[in-house]
């Protein structure tokens, strides 16, 4: 997926679990544009993961074996925490 195709990335952010939408959609909306190109590619790679894995990782019930994916999970968690709650 092209890092500049925001419509397609936005669609990929929409998950089957409300809990994931609450974490991923605000991060995309408020933070994606400020990411480096490498981190944008990493975020897109994270979106290819299965919903149950994403849910567990974002809820701190385990972590991905891939350290770069883990770094992106932590970035999402930290930026969402710093920003505070927003409407989805």
UniProtKB/Swiss-Prot annotation:
Gene3D superfamilies, alphabetized: Flavinator of succinate dehydrogenase
Keywords: Chaperone, Cytoplasm
Single biological process term from Gene Ontology: succinate metabolic process
Coiled-coil stretches noted in the UniProt entry, renumbered to this chain: none
GO cellular component, one term: cytoplasm
Keyword Chaperone on entry: yes
Pfam families given in the database record: Sdh5
Main location (coarse class): cytoplasm
Subcellular localization(s) per the UniProt record: Cytoplasm
NCBIfam families, alphabetized: PRK10878.1
UniProt similarity note: Belongs to the SdhE FAD assembly factor family.
Oligomeric and partner information: Monomer.
Role summary: An FAD assembly protein, which accelerates covalent attachment of the cofactor into other proteins. Plays an essential role in the assembly of succinate dehydrogenase (SDH, respiratory complex II), an enzyme complex that is a component of both the tricarboxylic acid cycle and the electron transport chain, and which couples the oxidation of succinate to fumarate with the reduction of ubiquinone (coenzyme Q) to ubiquinol. Required for flavinylation (covalent attachment of FAD) of the flavoprotein subunit SdhA of SDH and other flavinylated proteins as well.
PANTHER family: FAD ASSEMBLY FACTOR SDHE
The protein, known as: FAD assembly factor SdhE
Gene designation per UniProt: sdhE
């Amino acid at each position: 997926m092209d890092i500049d195709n925001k419509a397609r990335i936005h669609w990929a952010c929409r998950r089957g679990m409300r809990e994931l939408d609450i974490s991923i959609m605000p991060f995309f909306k408020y933070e994606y544009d400020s990411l480096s190109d490498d981190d944008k590619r990493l975020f897109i790679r994270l979106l290819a993961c299965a919903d149950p894995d994403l849910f567990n990782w974002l809820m701190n019930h385990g972590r991905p074996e891939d350290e770069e994916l883990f770094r992106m999970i932590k970035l999402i968690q930290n930026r969402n925490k710093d920003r505070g709650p927003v409407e989805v």
